[in-house]
Design a protein with these regions (language model features):
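A generic, well-ordered mixed alpha/beta core segment in the N-terminal half of proteins
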Residues: 104-105, 109-112
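Conserved beta-strand/loop subsegment of P-loop NTPase cores
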Residues: 45-49
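Helical "lid/coupling" subdomains associated with nucleotide-phosphate turnover
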Residues: 8-9, 13-42, 52-102, 117-122, ...
Length: 279
């Protein structure tokens, strides 16, 4: 399967005011035009375009949607947080073994972060929280490298939004955190010293001690140092530190002893739904 990600930062500068800035709209259009060229090269007959947090919350989203329609002929389907979480679960579940017990899926985005608590192939609870990394960085200014007081401020900000997560997990006590795609791909690439996008994975265990060592490297590093790390995805150099602060905070607060990584997430869930039922 062809897999390509392009950095857009659609919510930059306006996500807290629920607006798309003009430069962000232009970056989004440019990225979609690049994807359109690839789609043409592969003679693809069906295109599904999904909009998530930055679009669903933007007051001027129709401007972006109309430009995409005019330029490319594509209709963007904006999904709510509940459906996004359900599709993430559908994609992640394809990569997991049948017997998992209780586990928590975490998908860190720019505008939102999705958590899904499950037992084997059954969802117990799911929720999309508007606490993505782009929102965090527009709320709290981060030094380079990040300071201990800033880490505490980020953790307190996450904590204020996650009461429902703490409550449900204290009832069900998941023993595994499954980190999917995005930042977790980069954590694993750094661990395995693989250049980003050169390795196709299904699911793999991420030793906690190895993750903690990477976390320490990230929070002590400046932007230039991170950019030189083997395995670092260049589009994540800016946001990977806070993604790791968030991940470490979840592992520590919930006392979860096992970490898994999967590349599967939303797009695999969308494809599986399309293949199974149409969308």
């Amino acid at each position: 399967m062809y897999d390509r990600k392009l950095p857009v930062k659609l919510g930059r500068g306006g996500i807290h005011n629920n607006i798309l800035m003009q430069d962000a709209i232009e970056r989004g259009i440019t990225a979609l035009q690049h994807h359109a060229d690839t789609i043409h090269d592969y003679d693809v007959s069906k295109v599904i375009v999904i909009g998530t947090s930055a679009l669903r919350g933007a007051a001027n989203r129709d401007e972006f949607i109309e430009k995409v329609r005019e330029l490319l002929g594509w209709e963007i389907k904006i999904i709510d947080g509940e459906l996004e979480a359900a599709l993430i679960f559908r994609g992640v579940r394809l990569s997991l073994p049948d017997r998992m017990g209780k586990y928590l899926i975490m998908d860190i985005g720019g505008g939102s972060t999705e958590f899904i608590l499950a037992n084997d192939d059954q969802i117990i609870w799911k929720r999309s929280f508007n606490i993505g990394i782009a929102r965090a960085l527009e709320t709290i200014q981060m030094s380079d490298p990040v300071t201990s007081s800033e880490i505490l401020a980020f953790e307190q900000w996450f904590d204020r939004h996650l009461g429902e997560l703490w409550s449900i997990c204290n009832q069900h006590l998941p023993r595994t955190l499954v980190g999917c795609s995005g930042a977790f791909d980069t954590f694993m690439d750094i661990y395995e010293k693989e250049e980003s996008d050169l390795k196709i994975r299904k699911v793999s265990e991420f030793p906690l001690e190895a993750y903690r060592e990477i976390h320490q490297r990230l929070i002590l590093s400046d932007h230039q140092t991170r950019g030189k790390m083997i395995g670092m995805d260049k589009m994540r150099v800016e946001m990977i530190v806070i993604a790791s602060v968030f991940t470490n905070f979840i592992l520590r607060n919930l006392n979860i002893p096992k970490l898994l990584h999967t590349h599967n997430a939303l797009k695999e869930g969308v494809m599986d739904l399309f293949i199974s039922n149409g969308i």
